[in-house]
Amino acid sequence: GRDGYIVDTKNCVYHCYPPCDGLCKKNQAKSGSCGFLYPSGLACWCVALPENVPIKDPNDDCHK
């Protein structure tokens, strides 16, 4: 796995809601915590997330 800011299918971070630890574990990560990612703001950071779960691509924007 790898560490990173978990994102949805549109490359948008989760703003610490739902709570990060539960969100990350639901996606088979070891744990999660609330971090800050510029310029997105509050964002869930996951530890040891499986390769198939998308993480933030810093070269791409959130496509809402």
From Swiss-Prot:
Keyword Manganese: no
Tissue expression per record: Expressed by the venom gland.
Main location class: secreted
Subcellular location: Secreted
Keyword Cell membrane: no
Disulfide topology: 12-62, 16-34, 20-44, 24-46
Gene Ontology molecular-function annotations: sodium channel inhibitor activity; toxin activity
GO cellular component: extracellular region
Family: Belongs to the long (4 C-C) scorpion toxin superfamily. Sodium channel inhibitor family. Alpha subfamily.
Domain notes: Has the structural arrangement of an alpha-helix connected to antiparallel beta-sheets by disulfide bonds (CS-alpha/beta).
Protein name in the entry: Alpha-toxin Amm3
Organism for this UniProt entry: Androctonus mauritanicus mauritanicus
